[in-house]
């Protein structure tokens, strides 16, 4: 029936999302140390969930375009977290663990990371003003990209440093 087919689609999308997250995490573990990889990976669902909370407010639905937008922005979310996280770790290796070295690490990359994110937001923003059928179809793309990147900035400058500030394993 139509309902069971719809539930099957939801299950497939959920499974694909979990598999995608697992692959991102696995890749991060191969490239980074386990602690940093874990906190960088946790930034993805935090940024996505923060954005999803505002979907209804902006009239965004979960569909193929919104899923595509989430995939497009995934790499940017991970990239920002890796840049900030790696710089924090580098400062901690030089000055020792603690809030001072963590803050120094964040401050050093705050401007370039913010400028990079804002540039991406500005690049996607004109799609908001496209009219016609294409505008109706793709109008959600910039909203999602901007929302996710906004929450990503909050995550990499507030949540990620808080987790990496102490010298404990987790």
Residue ranges of model-derived segments:
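Interfacial segments of transmembrane alpha-helices in multi-pass membrane proteins
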Residues: 14-63, 129-133
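Helix-loop junctions and hydrophobic alpha-helical segments within the transmembrane domains
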Residues: 85, 91-115
């Amino acid at each position: 029936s139509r309902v069971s087919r719809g539930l099957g689609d939801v299950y497939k999308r959920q499974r694909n999302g979990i598999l995608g997250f697992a692959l991102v995490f696995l890749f991060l573990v191969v490239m980074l140390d386990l602690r940093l990889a874990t906190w960088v990976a946790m930034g993805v669902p935090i940024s996505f969930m923060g954005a999803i909370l505002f979907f209804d407010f902006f009239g965004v639905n979960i569909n193929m375009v919104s899923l595509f937008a989430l995939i497009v922005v995934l790499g940017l979310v991970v990239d920002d977290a890796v840049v900030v996280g790696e710089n924090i770790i580098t400062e901690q290796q030089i000055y020792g663990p603690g809030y001072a070295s963590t803050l120094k690490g964040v401050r050093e990359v705050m401007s370039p990371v913010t400028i990079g994110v804002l540039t991406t937001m500005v690049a996607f923003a004109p799609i908001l003003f496209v009219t016609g059928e294409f505008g109706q179809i793709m109008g959600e793309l910039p909203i999602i990209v901007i929302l996710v990147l906004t929450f990503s900035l909050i995550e990499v400058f507030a949540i990620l440093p808080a987790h990496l500030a102490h010298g404990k394993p987790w």
